[in-house]
């Protein structure tokens, strides 16, 4: 005897008998016409049943990873795809090159592959993240002092390297005593305190 399954007709006669809709969410019963909010159960998570209304935490499987299914409860390592890169879905397991977006820049997501200009935050200042596009005032740490990162705001005592001694690296008060080194003795840097 055929029973009703989630508002449609069940494909398996053994489905939906006795326990109603709960017993109806079986792989053999999960047809596209059977995907309703009331039918979203773990056993119902198959490719043909991945609809937005079915996107609940218990239904987050790789086969269900679609743009319409990107929700915080669905952020698992097997579901980290570019289309799922939203602020609420930024977890360490999701930190991949395709997921480097400003809203995804969290301390646990600072990896070399994520070092892009839009991802330069203080918490991301690591040696592997020292790139020209990442040279902002909040990101100037000693290990970031590279020739490509020599900017006026980067002129601090810990950043006085020969490679950083360029005209654009003048400190506000000429050359501080900590910067007075023979390797850094450029005419543009020769102030009264540096003689």
From Swiss-Prot:
UniProt GO BP: hair cycle
Expression by tissue: Expressed specifically in the middle/uper portions of the hair cortex. Not detected in the hair matrix or cuticle.
GO annotations of cellular component type: cytosol; keratin filament
Sequence repeat boundaries on the chain: 34-38, 39-43, 44-48, 49-53, 54-58, 59-63, 64-68, 69-73, 74-78, 79-83, 84-88, 89-93, 94-98, 99-103, 104-108, 109-113, 114-118, 119-123, 124-128, 129-133, 134-138, 144-148, 149-153, 154-158, 159-163, 164-168, 179-183, 189-193
Cited InterPro entries: KAP
Job description of the protein: In the hair cortex, hair keratin intermediate filaments are embedded in an interfilamentous matrix, consisting of hair keratin-associated proteins (KRTAP), which are essential for the formation of a rigid and resistant hair shaft through their extensive disulfide bond cross-linking with abundant cysteine residues of hair keratins. The matrix proteins include the high-sulfur and high-glycine-tyrosine keratins.
Similarity comment: Belongs to the KRTAP type 4 family.
PANTHER family linked to this entry: KERATIN ASSOCIATED PROTEIN (PTHR23262), KERATIN-ASSOCIATED PROTEIN 4-6 (PTHR23262:SF248)
Protein name per Swiss-Prot or TrEMBL: Keratin-associated protein 4-3
Naturally occurring in which organism (per UniProt): Homo sapiens
Gene: KRTAP4-3
